[in-house]
A protein has these predicted regions:
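Conserved alpha/beta cores of soluble small-molecule-handling proteins
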Residues: 1-180, 184-187, 213, 223-301
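Glycine- and Gly-Pro-enriched alpha-helical subdomains that act as flexible
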Residues: 179-180, 187-209, 214
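Secondary-structure junction motif
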Residues: 217-218
Length: 301
């Protein structure tokens, strides 16, 4: 595949970054990810707006405008579409690191002040298809989400160590499960790239935005709830709420909306998967994007 690296479109296996890049050394970088539906990029503007907010939070100047990133992203996708099966779609990622420190630039004197990458990869449709048939098993590990008074969860940065540690802990318990982190107060926060919704008595609730990354798919889902006349509230939620839920689902760029089978082995009260509210939102999401991504996943079973 072709990637964009610092002003050039190059083959993926030729895109190299200095070993002393601060994104590699310190996790000093930011990124955002969108996806295609039927080979068309979805909500790129919203993703780039979030990307820009994270760059400002990190005081990181990419040397590119968001209009530049839009053009580059579209070009990367278009150059790689011939490599993609007509039934597949891409994840598309924009990534910026702080590049090299002044001390390290002696070995790479021409390296720009920021490292800028835009690349794409096929979505793991086959690996995730079972989640749409059976639902996802979630486990909350002992690792907690970094508190907002330390680092804002609203910034999408390279620092995913708490998610990685959570994934390792959960994988040791159940390789089929995904981790979902609690915050330092014991409230539900987020998974590695996913937000959570709880359904109780046909009313929905999701953790407050100030404690989680404000997912674009999360916002799309809230808008779909309003369109369908479903009440949705942003509030603190803990495991008591999850264990008493009728339905649970997660949202993310790649998953869109995916039902949860269990959390810490506890099953929601509605035994069908997906439950009726989740199913109605999946249908509305499919209609919104004008592409049946739900069947796209199920066809890989």
């Amino acid at each position: 595949r072709i990637v964009y690296l610092n002003g050039k479109f190059v083959p993926e296996d030729e895109a190299t970054v200095p070993i002393k890049d601060q994104g590699f050394k310190y996790g000093d970088g930011v990124f955002d990810t969108t996806r295609t539906f039927g080979h068309k990029i979805f909500r790129l503007k919203e993703h780039l707006e979030r990307f820009e907010r994270t760059l400002k939070y990190m005081d990181l100047d990419p040397g590119h405008s968001m209009e530049d990133f839009q053009t580059i992203t579209e070009e990367v996708v278009n150059r790689n579409l011939p490599l993609l099966d007509e039934k597949e779609d891409y994840w598309v990622t924009q990534r910026v690191t702080r590049g090299l420190s002044n001390d390290d630039k002696t070995a790479w004197p021409d390296w720009p002040d920021a490292t800028v990458i835009v690349e794409c990869s096929p979505l793991p449709l086959a690996a995730r298809a079972k989640f749409y048939r059976d639902g996802i098993q979630l486990i909350t590990p002992s690792v907690r989400r970094v508190a907002p008074e330390m680092v804002s969860p609203r910034a999408k940065t390279h620092n995913y160590i708490n998610f990685v540690m959570g994934d390792l802990e959960v994988a040791a318990q159940n390789p089929e499960a995904l981790s979902f982190l609690l915050d330092t107060q014991g409230n539900l926060s987020e998974g590695k790239g996913s937000n959570i919704f709880i359904v109780k008595d046909n009313k929905l609730a999701t953790p407050k935005e100030q404690y989680v990354l404000p997912g674009v798919s999360r916002q799309v889902t809230i808008q779909l709830c309003e369109r369908l006349g479903l009440e949705v509230e942003e509030k603190n939620l803990d495991l008591f709420d999850a264990y008493n839920a009728d339905e649970i689902f997660i949202t993310s760029t790649s998953f869109c909306i995916c039902p949860v089978q269990s959390i810490n082995g506890r099953l929601p009260f509605v035994s069908s998967c997906p439950g009726p509210v989740t199913e109605s939102l999946i249908k509305a999401y499919v209609e919104l994007v004008d592409f049946d991504w739900y069947t796209q996943y199920l066809d890989r079973l």
